[in-house]
């Protein structure tokens, strides 16, 4: 099981592994659909696209939430099931922004109890630099049963932060 960083070489060796899922998290805040279009042209073979606004965030409510609030757990579980992720699935996430968006999905899966998730070391730019295989084929994975096992202590509220702002025991 890989749970932090994973090399392009190791990922390349598992491209045909039915127990592995590759999730492309490329995204640009100022052009939300740009990277999804790029994904349609080229991505890791067998990858699924994760749109930050649609798949990895709940709708923004002006004055109430941040830009990308966490989705409801039931919605995330449904999305992960549709992506073919079960408790036995090794997931690899990547982006082209130094891991900024891939790490969001890495954290979400870990928060929901899925430890077999790793970030592609160097992301999409390194994959291309090493001339690894790419594809334009849209992969539709078999649905799996994702069961969330929430790690409640991984999430803090704004109130928690305010209440502990000056507490030297909380870092």
Predicted regions and their residues:
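Cytosolic catalytic domains that perform sulfur/thiol-centered chemistry
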Residues: 1-171
